[in-house]
């Protein structure tokens, strides 16, 4: 079974962009109530916990593990040995631990297990030279995406400004993703 890590906190760049957006919103005269609500959401993500597994992500993984253990309890017996694999990412390691805890709960016993870290399988996009050269650093591979983004981004920024009751916002596209995250949480 392959599973992605649980819900995580925003990354450092997202948190910093969120702070910049709030400053921009204040400068543009956005409603203090909206700014305050967005600030409270952003404040719930300290930089020290950037990109780490959120508590809801830990609960999500425990529940997934529990349901998996219950579903496959008839397949396993107490003598079986299970290998859990994750990448070296702290949020993936935390997800594995929570999944394993839930899996044991679902089976009704502590499963005998071992653990492997395999970035070569699970984070190929960071270490595979061919992927890095041909995809990640290949500007032409993202030409359609760039074309779409360049056309649509100004409309999205204007929509966000309208929802915030301000005439305009000076946002880069990197800042917008954090704005959307905060707006979804507070509006």
Model-found features: residue ranges?
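Signature for phosphate-centric chemistry
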Residues: 1-83, 87-187
């Amino acid at each position: 079974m392959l599973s992605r890590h649980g819900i995580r906190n925003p990354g450092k760049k997202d948190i910093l962009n969120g702070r910049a957006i709030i400053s921009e919103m204040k400068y543009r005269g956005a409603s203090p109530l909206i700014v305050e609500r967005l600030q409270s959401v952003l404040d719930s993500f300290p930089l020290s916990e950037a990109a780490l597994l959120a508590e809801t992500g830990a609960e999500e993984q425990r529940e997934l593990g529990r349901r998996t253990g219950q579903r496959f309890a008839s397949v396993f017996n107490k003598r079986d040995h299970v290998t859990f694999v994750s990448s070296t990412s702290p949020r993936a390691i935390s997800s594995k631990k929570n999944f394993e805890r839930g899996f044991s709960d679902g089976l009704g016993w502590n499963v005998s297990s071992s653990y492997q870290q395999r970035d070569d399988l699970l984070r190929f996009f960071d270490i595979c030279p061919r992927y890095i050269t041909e995809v990640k650093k290949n500007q032409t591979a993202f030409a359609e995406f760039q074309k779409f983004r360049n056309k649509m981004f100004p409309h999205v920024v204007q929509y966000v400004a309208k929802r915030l009751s301000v005439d305009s916002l000076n946002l880069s596209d990197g800042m917008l993703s954090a704005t959307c995250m905060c707006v979804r949480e507070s509006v």
